[in-house]
Amino acid sequence: MLEKVETFDMNRVIDEFDEMTRNAHQVQKQTLKEILLKNQSAIYLQNCGLNGNATDPEEAFKSMVPLVTDVELEPYIKRMVDGDTSPILTGHPVPAISLSSGTSQGRPKFIPFTDELMENTLQLFRTAFAFRNRDFPIDDNGKALQFIFSSKQYISTGGVPVGTATTNVYRNPNFKAGMKSITSPSCSPDEVIFSPDVHQALYCHLLSGILFRDQVQYVFAVFAHGLVHAFRTFEQVWEEIVTDIKDGVLSNRITVPSVRTAMSKLLTPNPELAETIRTKCMSLSNWYGLIPALFPNAKYVYGIMTGSMEPYVPKLRHYAGDLPLVSHDYGSSEGWIAANVTPRLSPEEATFAVIPNLGYFEFLPVSETGEGEEKPVGLTQVKIGEEYEVVITNYAGLYRYRLGDVVKVIGFYNNTPQLKFICRRNLILSINIDKNTERDLQLSVESAAKRLSEEKIEVIDFSSYIDVSTDPGHYAIFWEISGETNEDVLQDCCNCLDRAFIDAGYVSSRKCKTIGALELRVVAKGTFRKIQEHFLGLGSSAGQFKMPRCVKPSNAKVLQILCENVVSSYFSTAF
């Protein structure tokens, strides 16, 4: 998504955003009014008692339409997937259905995808780019190294196209037209982006980037995991890539005919470039600064680096060297929410300003005790320093939909809140009175990984599970690590993991033995890649994949993969 600066009025886009955010309250009321007008014939809204005649549509909406999750909407969306063209959630048939990654619950969710969501995507890309390009100007004639993988759509039994959200965006006929004035070419041919084989596509993305190395302005993947995975793969295949460049002949590993044809057109024998890449790679110390070494004119590295992606940031920073890491914007399969308008902030500090016309937003206060539930507040009513669950209403038939994301209000951009992603609300480790979030798990792993780093070893990936097969139940943490070390070190890591969970309920439960000793389970190399392959087989896009941090019992296949690949385990002696 590299944009051509000469045809893009950066200042106008920023001015429009400033105007909209100054009037955030009015924009929210108008957005809800338009959503309800557009979908007034929807059966769901009529069942709630909305008939379009309310004198105050906003108050009527909030009093008559309940807060829901995907569970309540699933029967309605299933009818749409099955081909029911009546106005179920929207006033008109939806052109496609999106699949979520499915990593949280072990199964993908179906989510309506409409032309309005496509327009929202284009608006957010324009807004975010304006602020990004103001801080990190790019060359008009540059290219982007984008690790994009657009999986296939399939047609449901009811005749509706179904694909991941990213696939629905990239395959939408309006995408290229809408991005034309703000897009410079990707290094990779379309045949690579739409390849049915993600492994071959990744190899070709890397090769394409190096062929155009001097033109690359930034490096992008939707998620930080995708960037780290790409350059870990490069460590393994770089010599093969160098040979391809030297001889001008594509590796035999590329067997998809369309991909092979497209890539072969880019390749001619280039011994000089091959030797340059070989020299660069051989001169690096443990691959530090790999990205700027390969792409000397790159301005930054770009992708989602918050939330469940935060554990990958240290490794990504290692590859990026001195290049800035810029956090991608805030959204989900259900729709976009906010843009990064402060791109110079590090991923750890990144905040996102809500774009008031992307949907109607409410925020459900998160109770520290978890007892009772307060009423949601509006976009401009949130308070700095408080945490909320995001509730979204959009044009695609989601009404007062609890997103499950917990965010913290860091400040305001004019009158729209700037949010920091905290965690997924339902990803909580809990056995007794303990409550540990995804963020708590990340902090625990980061703390224990410091002991491992003393041995020049790193945590490649991790997940967790509540093991209640023992009495009392206990936390099981799965680690895949980059090398071998002695048992004493791993025992230290296990104890450190246990001590790092500082939730009062957990500590007291451990001390009185109502929660058992934490277990560290080390798995074989490649285990987490097997998990990714599992989700790709379910229809997830490689670019959309997120590793499940807390494996639920319903996620039986993932748990099976983890347990079958355990090579050693350790029980904490910290308490």
UniProtKB/Swiss-Prot annotation:
GO terms for cellular component: cytoplasm. Residues 10-30 form a coiled coil. Disruption phenotype: Long hypocotyl phenotype under continuous far red (cFR) light. Suppression of COP1 disruption. Decreased sensitivity to jasmonic acid (JA) and methyl-jasmonate (MeJA) inhibition of root elongation, but increased sensitivity to abscisic acid during seed germination. Reduced induced systemic resistance (ISR) mediated by P.fluorescens (CHAOr and WCS417r) and P.putida LSW17S in roots toward H.parasitica and P.syringae pv. tomato in leaves. Increased susceptibility to the fungi P.irregulare, U.vignae and U.appendiculatus. Enhanced sensitivity to ozone O(3). InterPro entries: GH3, GH3_C, GH3_M. An L-alpha-amino acid binds at residues 166-170, 530-534. Activated by GSTU20/FIP1. Its EC number is 6.3.2.52. It holds the Pfam family GH3. Keywords: ATP-binding, Coiled coil, Cytoplasm, Immunity, Innate immunity, Jasmonic acid signaling pathway, Ligase, Nucleotide-binding, Plant defense. Jasmonate binds at residues 101, 328-331. Induction: Rapidly induced by auxin. Accumulates locally in response to wounding. The gene is JAR1. ATP binds at residues 98, 118, 121, 163, 168, 331-336, 557. Belongs to the IAA-amido conjugating enzyme family. Interacts with GSTU20/FIP1 under continuous far red (cFR) light; this binding increases its activity and determines the priority of substrate binding. It catalyses: a jasmonate + an L-alpha-amino acid + ATP = a jasmonyl-L-amino acid + AMP + diphosphate + H(+); (+)-7-isojasmonate + L-isoleucine + ATP = L-isoleucine-(+)-7-isojasmonate + AMP + diphosphate + H(+). It is found in: Cytoplasm. This is Jasmonoyl--L-amino acid synthetase JAR1.
